[in-house]
Amino acid sequence: MHAANPVNVAGLLLAAGAGRRMGRPKALVELGGVTLVERGVRLLTAGGCRPVVVVTGAAADEVGIVVRRLATRRVAGPAPAGWDAPEIGLEPTAGLIPEVRLVSAARWTEGVGASLRAGLAALVGTDTDAVVVTLVDQPSLGAAAVQRLISAAADPGSAHPAMTATYGGRPAHPVLLRRSVWPEVAALARGEAGARAWLRAHPGEVTGVPCDGTGSPADVNTPADLETPADLETPADLASGDTHTQPG
């Protein structure tokens, strides 16, 4: 049995990519007047995640400036032994968004797997029970989807160590991972697979949580994708915590 229902749920925003098809790092792209990295942080915060860890790579300094608008100090330390992760830099905030931390993934060019490993490693020494993972290039996700995953995982009848949002029955982000499976997920996270390798290898340990009507998991990969984003929450929604919900 993989255990206990989460009490403390962190958010993990993977924002390290170079965005080659976009022409610049997606984290710095603005949509609705908000950079995608800030939008992702606000999404996870509005969904109930504390802290929110942002993993950077390409244009780390520039992305860090955006996040540091909320941050006040830096704490550095080595990665936990055996996690194959770089030196971790954590930056707690004390401003608009509580508890936001920056983690630099030195091996980000290897793919999203390296970013996921670095993010999980940063949370090993915390009291976090589970983590909700999102990607910076999915700006139309709804905070209500994050809330549904956390609620489903907290259900006393829920024993599965992983949850995925589903849209029309198809699994997508956000993904919730209990602490008990982080080492297994990290071991399989290579290249562009991220958590997908573990999820596919353990279908019987994954709960699908219907999130239709909460937003869209559609990626933005090119400038053309920015012209018609699906179900985009406004900056005011993200700031206030108001989110897409399914009627009824």
Name each region found by the language model:
Residues 2-171, 179, 202-213, 224:
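Nucleotide and nucleotide-moiety/phosphate-recognizing core
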Residues 2-7, 190-248:
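Conserved alpha/beta core of the MobA/IspD/sugar-nucleotide pyrophosphorylase nucleotidyltransferase superfamily
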Residues 62-63, 184, 219, 228:
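Phosphate- and divalent-cation-binding pockets in alpha/beta enzyme and binding domains
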Residues 143, 184, 216:
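Conserved protein kinase catalytic core
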Residues 170-202:
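Short, glycine-/small-residue-rich phosphate/pyrophosphate-handling segment
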